[in-house]
Amino acid sequence: MRDENDDDDVKRNTTNTNTFRRAFVTGAASIFTASAAFFQTSSSAFAKLPEFQYEDSELRTAASGMQYADVVVGTGASPQKGQTIQAHYTGRLTNGRTFDSSYERGSPLKFKVGVRQVIQGWDDGILGAEGIEGMKVGGKRVLIIPPELGYGARGAGGVIPGNATLKFDVELVAVL
C-alpha cells in the first residue's frame, strides 16, 4: 500500500533527476562551446604558420611507407635511444589543416626519443630506421607518416581522424 509520503518521494526524486540532467546538459554544452571556440581560434592562428619547403623529388620512402625529406641537414649531435631531446614541430593533416604546433606555443616539445613517448613515426623519423638516417641537432625534416606509424584507426583527441596520414615539419633543437 502506498501513502502520500511515497508520492512525495517519487516527485522529489524525479525533480532531482531532471535538475541534474538539465545541469549536466547545460554544463556539457558550455564545455563544448568553449572547446569549439578554442579550436576555431587556434585553427585560424595555425593558418599563418609557414611550411618547410621541399621538392617532391626530395621525398624518400622507407620500407614502412613513411616518407621524409631533409630541408636542412643538422650539424650537431645525433640523439640515441632513450635520450631526452627538444624538438619544434608543426603537425598537419594531408588536407593542409594544422592540428598542433610547438612554434605556435613558443616552446619546443621535450621528450625521451625511442621509448614510445611519441608516435612511432616520430621515433623512427628522428632516430632513423629502415634506411632513414637519424637527425642531427639543427636539422629540419618533413615526415609524412602513414596511419600505422601514427594514431592508427583510433585517431587522437577528436582532432586527428582515424586512419589519417600525418605531415610533420620537425626541427631538432637539442639533445639534453
Task: Report the location of each language-model feature.
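Cross-family detector of peptidyl-prolyl cis-trans isomerase
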Residues: R2-L176
